[in-house]
Each structure stands twice: as structure tokens, then as C-alpha cells.
Amino acid sequence: MPINSERLAHTFEALVQCDSVSRSEGRFAGQLQARLEALGVATLFDRSAPRTGSDTGNLVGRRAGTIDKAPLLFSAHMDTVQPGVGIRPVFEDGIFRSAGDT
């Protein structure tokens, strides 16, 4: 299946622009959850938020596979470091970069 570069770039821009500074990544987590569920992935949040001081727990997604295929695990951070609010991505010469003010 070919990659839809335009859709991928649009998705990347939308996610980068969602503020997600450490312990305040709940809005980003909600966006990610909606995107995963739209792809048929069952999601849940664990109860780690009170222990970490975050406004959200870890997002866990699971999609049933088949016996004849190897399982796949994907793990990533949802938070960014300061300054991570108001990030404006710029796409130039086939490369994304920050506008330089964050």
C-alpha cells in the first residue's frame, strides 16, 4: 500500500501543534486515542496519573491480530519538554522544522 504523503504531513502537523508539555499531555492523549479508535484499535488509559502528577494516564491500545503473524509493539512518549507550547511546524524543501520560536 503506498503512503499518502499529504495525509501523513497533515497528521504530523496536527499532532505537533497539540501542546503536550510533561504532565499536561491529556489533550494530546485524547487526540491520539480518537485516531487509534478510528483505526479499530481498542484503547484504555491506565491509572498512573495520580502517581506521575500528569493529567492523564498512559494510553494503551490493542488490536487483535492473527496467529500466523508476529506481534508488534509500539511505544512512544506523548509529552514534550519546555518550551513545548505553541509549536508551529514549518515544511520547507521536504523537511519539517520548528518555526524557531519554541
Where do the language-model regions lie?
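Short, functionally important structural connectors and interaction interfaces within domains
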Residues: 7-13, 51, 70-73, 81
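A non-catalytic alpha/beta surface segment that caps or lines the substrate-entry region
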Residues: 20-68
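N-terminal capping segment at the start of a domain
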Residues: 1-26
